[in-house]
């Protein structure tokens, strides 16, 4: 994984290497699904070293590693869920119930992809292309592009996961669900309980806990959360944009843990939902941007008001100390203000308990 996915990224940052080396590294083809089957094998090897692996039949292991439906976009498979299914004889017997259920799930995923995701792309792609080309992006265009990509990504990603689950079910093999209506989340902790759930599980079990989890004090716990999400961002792609996206989510996970937010909210709160959705949308912008420059142009357009723009800070001639003071003041207000905000915000009177479902 390091050679195929990250070597070009690392080589590109070394200024003294010959251009031929850089070109050769960037020309290495990336095998389909390498990120997913690498994670499945890491989990198997770690658990084997811990003595937690019960199923070791080479044929079942081979099926587990090479099982193809999930390789494009997940879910991330775990041997404890998959290998026992390959060991059961009934898995290989055709069942019309599995074929019917699998076909229905597959069609739902296909419709999400073709009808929703693909129709969001024309509203998102041109805006990011305009920002990349150096064109003027208005605030309205930037927000439309950011929101369109937010829905495009979810419906595209969850569609592929649904199709993988459905196709696998046709074969009589059950894959874990990967999404649970993530845009219903009322905080970032809740979001990561709903978004790419199998990846969240892997990062928790094989990275966060390995770093120490919450066993060494609060500060270490927050640092472990941040590092876990930082590396989780890097897993998505070899680009600084993914790293910063991971850092963005890691920062908010740490802040929310420090604020003591409800990790399993049972009631829907529209104010908390709106704030969480805003954080998610802001994060998706840098996730989608080709580079930091494009992300900066998008953010500059999104957070411009009338004739005033973020770029006008350049003409304010602020000193480094003044900028640092503003940053510290903002973070202080954000930390202490958000703590009171979350503690005092009341659910809407008509709100009903949030129903956890599998509607994707």
List each model region and its residues.
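Membrane-embedded transmembrane alpha-helical bundles that form the catalytic cores
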Residues: 1-329, 333, 337-360
């Amino acid at each position: 994984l390091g050679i195929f996915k990250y070597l070009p990224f690392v080589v590109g940052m070394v200024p003294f290497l010959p251009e031929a080396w850089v070109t050769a590294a960037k020309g290495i083809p990336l095998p389909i699904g390498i990120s997913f089957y690498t994670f499945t094998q890491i989990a198997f090897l770690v658990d084997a070293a811990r003595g937690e692996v019960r199923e070791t039949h080479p044929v079942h292991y081979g099926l587990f590693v090479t099982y193809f439906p999930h390789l494009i976009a997940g879910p991330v498979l775990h041997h404890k869920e998959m290998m026992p299914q390959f060991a059961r004889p009934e898995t290989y017997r055709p069942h019309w119930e599995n074929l019917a259920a699998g076909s229905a799930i597959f069609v739902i995923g296909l419709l999400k992809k073709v009808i929703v995701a693909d129709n969001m792309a024309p509203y998102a792609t041109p805006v990011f292309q305009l920002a990349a080309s150096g064109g003027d992006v208005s605030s309205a265009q930037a927000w439309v592009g950011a929101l369109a990509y937010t829905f495009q990504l979810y419906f595209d990603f969850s569609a592929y996961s649904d199709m993988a689950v459905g196709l696998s079910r046709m074969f009589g093999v059950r894959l874990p669900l990967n999404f649970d209506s993530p845009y219903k989340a009322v905080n970032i902790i809740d979001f990561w309980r709903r978004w790419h759930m199998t990846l969240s599980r892997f990062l928790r079990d094989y990275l966060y806990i390995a770093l120490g989890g919450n066993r060494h004090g609060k500060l270490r716990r927050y640092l472990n959360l941040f590092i876990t999400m930082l590396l989780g961002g890097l897993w998505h792609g070899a680009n600084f944009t993914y790293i910063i996206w991971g850092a963005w989510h890691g920062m908010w996970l740490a802040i929310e843990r420090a604020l003591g937010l409800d990790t399993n909210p049972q009631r829907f709160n529209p104010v908390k939902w709106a704030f969480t959705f805003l954080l998610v949308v802001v994060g998706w912008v840098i996730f989608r941007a080709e580079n930091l420059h494009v992300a900066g142009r998008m953010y500059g357009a999104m957070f411009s008001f009338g004739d005033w723009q973020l770029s006008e800070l350049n003409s304010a001639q602020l000193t480094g100390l003044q900028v640092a003071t503003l940053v510290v003041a903002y973070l202080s207000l954000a930390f202490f203000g958000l703590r009171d905000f979350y503690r005092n915000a009341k659910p809407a009177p008509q709100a009903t308990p949030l129903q956890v479902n599998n509607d994707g």
